[in-house]
């Protein structure tokens, strides 16, 4: 469960413009809402046993609040783990920066929280590149679970152009 908590934290990363940039891009939250599949990511110890992560990103009643349901398949035994979390928009100008927290006791006071940015996304919201603000950990999300190798290569080139470390890449989806 601890691994899944950090997986979610990692997955909540938010993206920016199509070209390499030091800033995140504007996000249309109505279009960002919905189901995403993690297809690529940087290596991190929290997610080392997980593959085929699925993220359901759903707006709550408040305009700046979201609920997340993250599902991950463990590589070792195929067991499915799930985690529920909350996200709050921290930059309402761009809507591209979020703070993730766990509900209940662990999330009190934001102690179990992490900031994530959307660094890049498709104009039609078919894919997004997410990372921590310092880009130390990053993720590529896609609306489709099955993505061609050509599409993966293209998205990884975009991530590389934004300064994401390709030496730590993990192919996780589809």
Where are these regions (language model features)?
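Bacterial N-terminal signal peptides that target proteins for export
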Residues: 1-7
């Amino acid at each position: 469960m601890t691994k899944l908590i950090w997986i979610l934290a990692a997955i909540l990363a938010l993206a920016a413009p199509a070209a390499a940039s030091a800033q995140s891009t504007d996000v249309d939250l109505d279009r960002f809402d919905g189901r995403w599949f993690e297809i690529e990511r940087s290596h991190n110890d929290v997610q080392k046993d997980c593959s085929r992560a699925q993220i359901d990103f759903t707006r709550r009643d408040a305009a700046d609040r979201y609920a997340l349901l993250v599902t991950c398949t463990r590589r070792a035994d195929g067991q499915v783990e799930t985690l529920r979390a909350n996200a709050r928009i921290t930059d309402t100008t761009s809507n591209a920066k979020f703070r993730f927290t766990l509900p209940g006791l662990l999330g009190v006071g934001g102690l179990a929280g992490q900031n994530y940015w959307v660094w890049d996304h498709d104009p039609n919201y078919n894919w997004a590149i997410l990372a921590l603000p310092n880009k130390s950990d990053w993720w590529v999300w896609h609306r489709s679970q099955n993505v061609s190798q050509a599409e993966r290569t293209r998205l990884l080139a975009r991530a590389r152009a934004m300064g994401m470390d390709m030496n730590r890449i993990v192919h996780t989806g589809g």
